[in-house]
Amino acid sequence: NGDYKGCYQLCDHIDVRKNRVEIEEMSSGDLTGGYMIEIDAYADAEPKKFYTKLYNIPVTIKYPDDDEITYEQENYIASHFIKLTTAVYSSGYSDPANGFGQYMDIETFLRHFLVGEYSGNTDTYWSVRMTKKKDDDKFNFGPVWDFDLAFENDRSTYPINENAKLTNEWLCMQ
């Protein structure tokens, strides 16, 4: 009708269920999966969270739900994520047997990273969802989401470290 009504943002919630994010439901005795966690800048506001000793990375447990997860399951997923971060920051990080590749699916990581970089999404580095399926030691990255700050809608960056800066809108390390 020609009347400007402003901008609209279409979005959706991430749900763990069939045809969405399919993670096998665990019984209280299961430990190895499935889980959904998030590297989460707002972890302080969440009831189920942990922080890594190395770099104090804030992580929230998104699935199983707060009222369903057991203490043992919380400890298991926190310990498993801490093994990943320890491997990433170790001197042998690229070693096929002992490096980070034993704890994360490289292909899903690269997809997540490239989508974040191509879209210029500042949330890519401080709101990262990962899943871990039963009997699979690797974290899978995704689904990608939260594009409200992408495509030049936010000109700032959440620095990976103190040497990160924007150069022609691309993140570079110096």
Regions found by a protein language model. Give the residues of each.
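Phosphate/dinucleotide-binding and metal-coordinating scaffold of catalytic cores
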Residues: N1-Q174
